[in-house]
């Protein structure tokens, strides 16, 4: 352990003891990291620690932050997109989405993404690597400092496929819950759905977190297998009917309903027949549908569905007994909305 971010009180007490310090020095480090949320995440800034202890930690390579801000982009609606650089000079983006009572942090779990969904900017440049838990957590601290308020909600809907980084994902969730004091019920993990990984997520959550109270969101985006394969190449490996069965098992094991994300693409998946197919697919188990308007990116020719089609689609789902919401896009003027995050500054 060299990065202190993500460490528990016990971890930090042990660090202090290893250096011949009293255990309370570890608690001081813990308070400095999580309770004060300092921007200067530098060992030198922990002035409550003896100077010689700080120097030894620095010499031995301990640190609190690995990321550096490269760009800040503030949208007209108050949404903030940050372009961050890692120690190995890769780039990731994260987004702070404010409302009057909440600040939602949209976090990246990987540098890039291997899934290559046809409507999403992130996958156009492929996957570089997965993020460490400390790099995931650091995004929260930067959002909080830049927006001068505490994050209340977390969505893993930034760059990357979270279930392909499942161990670091769950370690970060454990720290978000235990150390950042954000309830699991205010955390959403979004996945395009990877074979066998939904059941693995449930099992590993009980191992690492002792329970599973976060929300699982499936990026479904289609009501039938043929359509899904045209917009999500990886869908060829995981049929919709199997995704639904695995989600039903997840609900039984965790007691948590599943959300299904459905991006409305004009002429592709927005007809009433698609709404009927989706209703039949989801009928009979605990779930919720989020309808999302498409956010334009340069490389593809998909178009937003009309507001009329969106409303008709929603009404048909409601009439068929499906719980549904319309998700409002935020940060559009700064390419900070769903599907628009990238690895570099081209997205400005």
Curated annotation (Swiss-Prot):
Q: Where is the active site?
A: 93 (proton acceptor), 338 (s-methylcysteine intermediate)
Query: One Pfam family name from the record?
Result: Radical_SAM
GO MF annotations, alphabetized: 4 iron, 4 sulfur cluster binding; metal ion binding; rRNA (adenine(2503)-C2-)-methyltransferase activity; rRNA binding; tRNA (adenine(37)-C2)-methyltransferase activity; tRNA binding
Compartments (UniProt record): Cytoplasm
What Gene3D superfamilies does UniProt report for this protein, alphabetically? 1.10.150.530, Aldolase class I
Q: What UniProt keywords are attached to this protein's entry?
A: 4Fe-4S, Cytoplasm, Disulfide bond, Iron, Iron-sulfur, Metal-binding, Methyltransferase, rRNA processing, S-adenosyl-L-methionine, Transferase, tRNA processing
Main function? Specifically methylates position 2 of adenine 2503 in 23S rRNA and position 2 of adenine 37 in tRNAs.
| HAMAP family tied to this protein | RNA_methyltr_RlmN (MF_01849)
Which family is annotated?
A: Belongs to the radical SAM superfamily. RlmN family.
Other remarks on this protein:
Reaction proceeds by a ping-pong mechanism involving intermediate methylation of a conserved cysteine residue.
What protein am I looking at?
A: Probable dual-specificity RNA methyltransferase RlmN
Q: State the species of origin.
A: Prochlorococcus marinus (strain AS9601)
């Amino acid at each position: 352990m060299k990065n202190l971010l993500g460490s528990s009180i016990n971890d930090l007490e042990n660090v202090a003891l290893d250096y011949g310090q009293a255990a309370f020095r570890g608690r001081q480090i813990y308070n400095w990291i999580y309770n004060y949320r300092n921007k200067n995440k530098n060992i030198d800034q922990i002035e409550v620690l003896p100077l010689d202890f700080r120097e030894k930690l620095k010499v031995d390579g301990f640190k609190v932050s690995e990321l550096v801000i490269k760009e800040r982009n503030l949208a007209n609606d108050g949404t903030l997109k940050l372009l961050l650089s890692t120690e190995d000079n890769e780039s990731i983006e994260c987004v702070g989405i404010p409302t009057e009572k909440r600040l939602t942090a949209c976090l990246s779990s990987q540098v890039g993404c291997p899934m290559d969904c046809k409507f999403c900017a992130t996958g156009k440049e492929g996957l570089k690597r997965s993020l460490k838990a400390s790099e995931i957590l650091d995004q929260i601290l930067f959002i909080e400092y830049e927006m001068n308020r505490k994050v209340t909600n977390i969505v893993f809907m930034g760059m990357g496929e979270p279930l392909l980084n499942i161990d670091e994902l769950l370690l970060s969730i454990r720290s978000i819950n235990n150390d950042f004091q954000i309830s699991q019920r205010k955390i959403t993990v979004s996945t395009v759905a990877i074979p066998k990984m939904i059941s693995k997520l449930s099992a590993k959550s009980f191992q690492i977190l002792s329970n599973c109270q976060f929300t699982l969101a499936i990026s479904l985006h289609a009501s039938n297998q043929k359509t899904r394969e045209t917009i999500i190449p990886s869908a060829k490996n995981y049929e919709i009917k199997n995704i639904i069965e695995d989600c039903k098992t997840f609900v039984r094991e965790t007691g948590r309903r599943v959300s299904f994300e459905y991006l409305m693409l004009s002429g592709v998946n927005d007809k009433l027949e698609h709404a009927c197919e989706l209703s039949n697919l989801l009928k009979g188990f605990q779930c919720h549908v989020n309808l999302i308007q498409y956010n334009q990116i340069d490389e593809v020719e998909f178009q937003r569905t009309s507001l009329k089609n969106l409303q008709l689609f929603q009404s048909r789902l409601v009439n068929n007994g499906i719980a549904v919401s319309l998700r409002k896009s935020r940060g559009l003027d700064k390419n900070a909305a769903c599907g628009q995050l990238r690895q570099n500054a081209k997205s400005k």
